[in-house]
């Protein structure tokens, strides 16, 4: 029988990692009104817990409002989130928009509905953020989501592009933040199990998960099993980009490159990989073990 860990032990490293990401990317500032998008999954529940904790202890004042979108999926348990959020004492809005019918009508039989569903959901949430005066929209994407997106774009889109911790929304009127960007999914999952969150299944619509994303996710899980710490190193590499050692002519002027009296880059020197030193230092920031 699997023993459930104490959430009070699992929570502090998660808070520390999220606080570091928030600080590094200046995600939350004085006077912000943060709209937390709550799906009923482990990630968004954990995100809400962390932000409510930081709200009480951070040296700045910011508001937190939880928002859930009921998309009309059959079997959606409408009572779960209102009851949970009421007990928690956090301000919340439940939006009701029947995007399920639209998605079913527009998506061919057998095809995944996730892309269209996501676009419709995003538009509704952006609009609501404007209506309530939210200055930031907080999403529950974590480290593993970011890395899956990176490799999805490389393998199937031929683009070096991931999922940023902070960005301007595509409608140009909102700022989206991902405070869980530094956190591993397995650590969030352990905490969610320990807390016993009332999880709402994400497959109520009957859509099958994206096969390509599932394959990439399994690949990353395999890497981490065989080489613990590899995923954290890949994430860190996204913060240490050297354009002169890539092939993008828009990022680096290869055509204009010429010999100068200044010292050139050390492209032919041996690389140094202080992996263990880095992981040892980071283990104090997030749960890596």
From Swiss-Prot:
Record EC number: 2.8.1.-
Cofactor: Mg(2+); [4Fe-4S] cluster
Cofactor details (free text): Binds 1 [4Fe-4S] cluster per subunit. The cluster is chelated by three Cys residues, the fourth Fe has a free coordination site that may bind a sulfur atom transferred from the persulfide of IscS.
Record keywords: 4Fe-4S, ATP-binding, Cytoplasm, Iron, Iron-sulfur, Magnesium, Metal-binding, Nucleotide-binding, RNA-binding, Transferase, tRNA processing, tRNA-binding
MF (Gene Ontology): 4 iron, 4 sulfur cluster binding; ATP binding; magnesium ion binding; sulfurtransferase activity; tRNA binding
Keyword ATP-binding among record annotations: yes
Gene3D superfamilies: HUPs
Catalysed reactions listed for this entry: cytidine(32) in tRNA + S-sulfanyl-L-cysteinyl-[cysteine desulfurase] + AH2 + ATP = 2-thiocytidine(32) in tRNA + L-cysteinyl-[cysteine desulfurase] + A + AMP + diphosphate + H(+)
Record localization: Cytoplasm
UniProt keyword Transport, yes or no: no
Pathway: tRNA modification
GO biological process: tRNA thio-modification
Residue positions of motif PP-loop motif: 39-44
Binding site for [4Fe-4S] cluster: 114, 117, 205
UniProt GO cellular component terms: cytoplasm
Biological role: Catalyzes the ATP-dependent 2-thiolation of cytidine in position 32 of tRNA, to form 2-thiocytidine (s(2)C32). The sulfur atoms are provided by the cysteine/cysteine desulfurase (IscS) system.
Additional detail: The thiolation reaction likely consists of two steps: a first activation step by ATP to form an adenylated intermediate of the target base of tRNA, and a second nucleophilic substitution step of the sulfur (S) atom supplied by the hydrosulfide attached to the Fe-S cluster.
Assembly with partners or alone: Homodimer.
NCBIfam families named among the record's database cross-references: PRK10696.1
Protein family membership: Belongs to the TtcA family.
Name this polypeptide is given: tRNA-cytidine(32) 2-sulfurtransferase
Organism encoding this protein: Deinococcus geothermalis (strain DSM 11300 / CIP 105573 / AG-3a)
